[in-house]
Amino acid sequence: MTKVNSQKYSKALLEVAQEKGQLEAILTEVSEMIQLFKENNLGAFLANEVYSFSAKSELIDTLLQTSSEVMSNFLNTIRSNGRLADLGEILEETKNAADDMFKIADVEVVSSIALSEAQIEKFKAMAKSKFDLNEVTVINTVNEKILGGFIVNSRGKIIDASLKTQLAKIAAEIL
């Protein structure tokens, strides 16, 4: 499925949830389903043509047992439109669209050593202002190859203040 189609389905779900005043509840359901899909590799199951439509439909019936009315209608629409193979992607796109709506993001900070809590808080504040976000979760990744400094990545926007990059720039200027 194309990203455009995933966006259409996710936008429709978010609009209906908003109209019914159930946006927060639906987003909770979406997060739970994403987790369920990851833990049980359900996306691969639904995308695999080896399994019959009825087997995949049984999975949706199981999900419907614990779903709200809005989510149930959404899942039934996905099933009737033959988009079960794309359900995982649609759920991820729904989460991304909601994160954009509420200005929420995970921010990866790559550093040569683990960051302290105080440093993480500073990166949260910096990311909120630089990327215009309301809520930030900092994910610290240690990579000794950057030598020092840091690289901040939030949804494709990158701030590279690593020593390795600065040295490479100096070397390029000299040569």
Curated annotation (Swiss-Prot):
Topological type in the membrane: Peripheral membrane protein
Alphabetical UniProt keywords: ATP synthesis, Cell membrane, CF(1), Hydrogen ion transport, Ion transport, Membrane, Transport
Signal is among the record's keywords: no
Chief location category: membrane
Subcellular localization: Cell membrane
GO CC annotations on file: plasma membrane; proton-transporting ATP synthase complex
A Pfam family per the record: OSCP
One of the record's GO molecular function terms: proton-transporting ATP synthase activity, rotational mechanism
Subunit details: F-type ATPases have 2 components, F(1) - the catalytic core - and F(0) - the membrane proton channel. F(1) has five subunits: alpha(3), beta(3), gamma(1), delta(1), epsilon(1). F(0) has three main subunits: a(1), b(2) and c(10-14). The alpha and beta chains form an alternating ring which encloses part of the gamma chain. F(1) is attached to F(0) by a central stalk formed by the gamma and epsilon chains, while a peripheral stalk is formed by the delta and b chains.
Chain's role: F(1)F(0) ATP synthase produces ATP from ADP in the presence of a proton or sodium gradient. F-type ATPases consist of two structural domains, F(1) containing the extramembraneous catalytic core and F(0) containing the membrane proton channel, linked together by a central stalk and a peripheral stalk. During catalysis, ATP synthesis in the catalytic domain of F(1) is coupled via a rotary mechanism of the central stalk subunits to proton translocation. This protein is part of the stalk that links CF(0) to CF(1). It either transmits conformational changes from CF(0) to CF(1) or is implicated in proton conduction.
Family stated for the protein in its record: Belongs to the ATPase delta chain family.
Protein name from the UniProt record: ATP synthase subunit delta
